[in-house]
Amino acid sequence: MKFVLLFGVLVVTLFSYSSAEMLDDFDQADEDELLSLIEKEEARAKECTPRFYDCSHDRHSCCRSELFKDVCTCFYPEGGDNEVCTCQQPKHLKYMEKAAGKAKKFGGKIKKWFG
């Protein structure tokens, strides 16, 4: 009975050690992947397309506004056959940015009043 108990403890210890090693390997791989994604995002951020400019060459290249990324919106102008794509900010995001700006100002006033 003691042998079975000792063997069980040994198996559980080895299993937990091996799973901890595997988790460390996964964490390191995730960390490396995250760093490479950040580097790619920084490189891509330097080449963004400003608002109301043509984004048909790369529809994911629109710049970020204060809080949200602009969206490449495509449409056909009236009486035209060619599709036109420009970076634009959706209205609901525009209103959310305005509300966030007003909330920041109001928060600053409250902080000023109650110091």
UniProtKB/Swiss-Prot annotation:
Expressed by the venom gland. Disulfide bonds join C48-C63, C55-C72, C62-C87, C74-C85. Residues 1-20 form the signal peptide. GO terms for molecular function: toxin activity. InterPro entries: Spider_toxin_CSTX_knottin, Spider_toxin_CSTX_Knottin_CS. It is found in: Secreted. GO terms for cellular component: extracellular region. Keywords: Disulfide bond, Knottin, Secreted, Signal, Toxin. Residues 21-44 form a propeptide. The presence of a 'disulfide through disulfide knot' structurally defines this protein as a knottin. Belongs to the neurotoxin 19 (CSTX) family. 01 subfamily. This is U3-lycotoxin-Ls1k. It comes from Lycosa singoriensis (Wolf spider). The lineage of its organism: Eukaryota, Metazoa, Ecdysozoa, Arthropoda, Chelicerata.
